[in-house]
């Protein structure tokens, strides 16, 4: 799914276009905890969050996400938007809830960043 399709599906406003282009979004994940993002985040993913802090932009850049979507009408600080511009990280603002945004993307075929049980790429074997 392309970022323009995400923007349309979420009825989002573009706070930062990331320098232009229309990147491919591989998958999506939703969390209000930066620690979760650092554990399961993947390059090329779309991050949906209501946590409108500078730390989210830093973590998103570290993971190399395709874009960040701030949900529930949350407005990130000017510092966060400025950092996103410097890092060429697209930032979208959606008026919809985290749940609603996730559903809108799911029905359009965008997979989640964490596979469902039984669909994992690798299986962890017990050493016990």
Q: Whereabouts are the PLM-identified features?
A:
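An N-cap/entry alpha-helix motif that binds or orients negatively charged groups
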Residues: 1, 5-29
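Feature captures the catalytic cores and cofactor-binding loops of soluble hydro-lyases/lyases
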Residues: 22-23, 27-46, 50-119, 127
């Amino acid at each position: 799914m392309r970022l323009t399709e995400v923007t349309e599906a979420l009825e989002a406003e573009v706070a930062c276009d990331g320098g232009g282009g229309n990147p491919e979004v591989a998958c999506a994940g939703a969390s209000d905890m930066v620690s979760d993002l650092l554990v399961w985040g993947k390059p090329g993913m779309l991050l949906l969050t209501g946590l409108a802090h500078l730390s989210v932009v830093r973590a998103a850049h570290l993971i190399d996400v395709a874009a960040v979507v701030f949900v529930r009408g949350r407005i990130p600080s000017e510092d966060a938007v400025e950092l996103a511009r410097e890092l060429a990280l697209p930032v979208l603002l959606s008026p919809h809830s985290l749940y609603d945004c996730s559903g809108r993307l799911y029905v359009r075929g965008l997979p989640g960043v964490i596979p469902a049980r039984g669909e994992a790429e690798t299986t962890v074997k017990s050493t016990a």
